[in-house]
């Protein structure tokens, strides 16, 4: 019984390590996970972030408009 419990613990720890490593790679992904959107009065297209209250940092967004419950963020 102890060997089976130890084996389950080892498998669980390995799964946590691999999941954490995968999340580190996802943080530095080269693409945005946003859809296209258009706001009234803006000539360009923006990035629609679904179920967010604010625009995420690090993408250079300077303006936005709300399309409840989503937000459309503009980089210009």
Curated annotation (Swiss-Prot):
Indicate the transmembrane segments per the record.
none
Q: Which InterPro entries match?
A: BDS_K_chnl_tox, Myo_ane_neurotoxin_sf
* One GO term (biological process): regulation of blood pressure
This protein's GO CC annotations: extracellular region; nematocyst
Q: Which SUPFAM superfamilies match?
A: Defensin-like
Propeptide residues are 20-31
In alphabetical order, the GO MF annotations are: ion channel inhibitor activity; potassium channel regulator activity; toxin activity
Q: Where does this one sit in the cell?
A: Secreted; Nematocyst
Disulfide bridges in this chain:
37-72, 39-65, 55-73
**Leader sequence residues:** 1-19
Please list the tissues where expression of this protein has been recorded: Weakly expressed in the ectodermal tissue from the distal and proximal tentacles, body wall, and oral disk.
Q: Name one Pfam family in it.
A: Defensin_4
Keywords attached to this entry: Cleavage on pair of basic residues, Disulfide bond, Hypotensive agent, Ion channel impairing toxin, Nematocyst, Neurotoxin, Potassium channel impairing toxin, Secreted, Signal, Toxin, Voltage-gated potassium channel impairing toxin
Its biological purpose is as follows: Blocks Kv3 voltage-gated potassium channels. Reduces blood pressure.
Similarity comment: family membership: Belongs to the sea anemone type 3 (BDS) potassium channel toxin family.
Q: By what name is this protein known?
A: Kappa-actitoxin-Avd4l
Q: What is the organism field in this record? A: Anemonia viridis (Snakelocks anemone)
